[in-house]
Amino acid sequence: MYDIKKWRHIFKLDSAKHISDDDLDAICMSQTDAIMIGGTDDVTEDNVIHLMSRVRRYPLPLVLEISNIESVMPGFDFYFVPTVLNSTDVAFHNGTLLEALKTYGHSIDFEEVIFEGYVVCNADSKVAKHTKANTDLTTEDLEAYAQMVNHMYRLPVMYIEYSGIYGDVSKVQAVSEHLTETQLFYGGGISSEQQATEMAAIADTIIVGDIIYKDIKKALKTVKIKESSK
């Protein structure tokens, strides 16, 4: 079993987006710690299994971040289950999880399931609109969510998600200072080695996604953060 606590860098692939064989090879051979397959819309069983079969040729951990029950399938090393803490819709807190457990609970290996305390911060993002997230958050709000995740819910991961834009470094820093046990994931807008380095100095793990589809060379440079330690 892989130890996610050791992961500093994850490439996140969108199952609904095209990626060439050459670019996928470069991503999977880049020394990233893991590949995560996710997405917000058009996530289907067919496109997830197609992308999974392409990535499975490479010897690195493969994660499915669950966005709907229909696309869940065996074959992944981990299943990351988001609970969107700032969503106004209970379905994104535990409703989807409830349905998944009713359907698959008898066959789940819970050692493979990682619960993520998500906080969505970009009001204009697809994920914010889809999850009906309240993104008007102060630093104090984020600190309270961090305490909730770390001390009360005791979740293994807190994911600060800016999805499409580069986040407020001071707010991410404030969250980090309140997490003593929970692993901090940061994702959103990382499009350069400099940004990757800046966020990797604060978060335990950075998630790099959109830039893969815009500029593969810039995406690959973000892996250089592994050459330094937090």
Curated annotation (Swiss-Prot):
Family: Belongs to the GGGP/HepGP synthase family. Group I subfamily.
Domain of life: Bacteria
Catalysed reactions, as listed in the record: sn-glycerol 1-phosphate + all-trans-heptaprenyl diphosphate = 3-heptaprenyl-sn-glycero-1-phosphate + diphosphate
The organism of origin for this protein: Staphylococcus aureus (strain bovine RF122 / ET3-1)
Transmembrane segments annotated in the record for this chain: none
GO biological process terms on file: glycerophospholipid biosynthetic process
Quaternary structure annotation from Swiss-Prot or TrEMBL: Homodimer.
Pathway: Membrane lipid metabolism; glycerophospholipid metabolism
Protein name per UniProt: Heptaprenylglyceryl phosphate synthase
